[in-house]
Amino acid sequence: HGIVSFSLGTDTAGSGRVPAALNNIVGLKPSLGSLSASGVVPACRTIDTVSVFAMTVEDAFNVFTLLNDYDEKDSYSKPFKKLPLSLPQSSMKIGIPDKSSIRFFDDNFQAESFESNIDKLKSYGFEILPINFEPFYEIAHLLYEGSWVAERYTVIENLLKVNPKAVHSVTRQIIQKAKNFSAADTFRDYYKLSELKRKINPILTSVKMLCVPSIPTFYSVKDLEVDPITPNSNLGTYTNFVNLLDMCGITVPTDPRKDGRPGSITFLGMSGDDNIVASIAILFEKNCNRFLGGTKFKLEKPNDLQENNNSYLDIAVCGAHMEGLSLNWQLKDLGAQFVQKSKTSSYYNFFALTNLNPVRPGLL
């Protein structure tokens, strides 16, 4: 009904993005460690993150910004700067799967939708760079066929021993494969992941972000009743590798496909680039004609992003917070950017505030 503006989920292999694509909503998958996971039941704790579902990119990013805070109680929490949305540079290079490696599983409507979305990106002036996605698929394969399944086993090990029928039969079938892995297998998979990361690194350094289909195709409930494993595996084509590569991402609805099903596209960036992928998503959202989720409410066009976003304030500092001095790091940790050195006019006076410990400077 459009009453709820956002909800939280978790994302290990795409659970924060695939449902968003299927339901015409935004799915924001943050950088690993940026949102506290205290109290969250994990799937794979080392690569899990809390995710955000919302009707619009702006709502999703606002929730992310509020939740982005270091948590000392969460051993996987990391400190991240809170950076605002801003107008993306039109010279930005965006990587997409090339024609030889892109996968749609014979869904022509999905292929046409993605091609149309890429044409929009080109119209904004972005440089599109087709890349071979086979190494990404190899990494995705590790998540469910490799020893990360054993990490899932640690979460429900006791339940499987005491009451195995309490676990869905398909889930049980997948996770019980963990018994076949040894500690040596785990190290081999980590070595394999490092090798694939090395192979992919030149690709990722040649572009600012990736743009992929959120899902390669759609499946019905009936499809999943016949074969619950293959369709789910296919739905993770463009999601399963993301957390293993420590990337962030956002799934944003686009114009509906020609058959009426929801259109969608996903932007992926490196860790800490959450504001960049959200900024390009909101730019993309601005030029789409769609309803919000399952409602009949039309998307209201978001405000134009500015090069110098109004989330920034111009401030002048004196004393130890100046560039190169001992407290300047406090400003930088809050996302401050140095602009210029300057001098005060003769009307200003500089004071030592001796009643403070340590003594602080004052400028009037």
PLM region spans:
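Flexible, acidic loop-helix segments that line cofactor/substrate-binding pockets
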Residues: 75-80, 92, 97-101, 131-145, ...
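Short Gly/aromatic-enriched secondary-structure transition segments
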Residues: 327-344
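Basic, polyanion-binding surface patches
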Residues: 342-364
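Alpha-to-beta junction loops
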Residues: 2-6, 207-210
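Short glycine-/acidic-enriched loop or helix-start segments at secondary-structure transitions
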Residues: 18, 105-106, 140, 220-223, ...
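Glycine- and acidic-residue-enriched helix-capping/strand-helix junction motifs
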Residues: 104-112
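Serine-dependent amide/ester hydrolase catalytic core
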Residues: 88-89, 98-102, 155-244, 286, ...
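Structural helix-boundary/capping segments
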Residues: 6, 10-100, 115-124, 180-191, ...
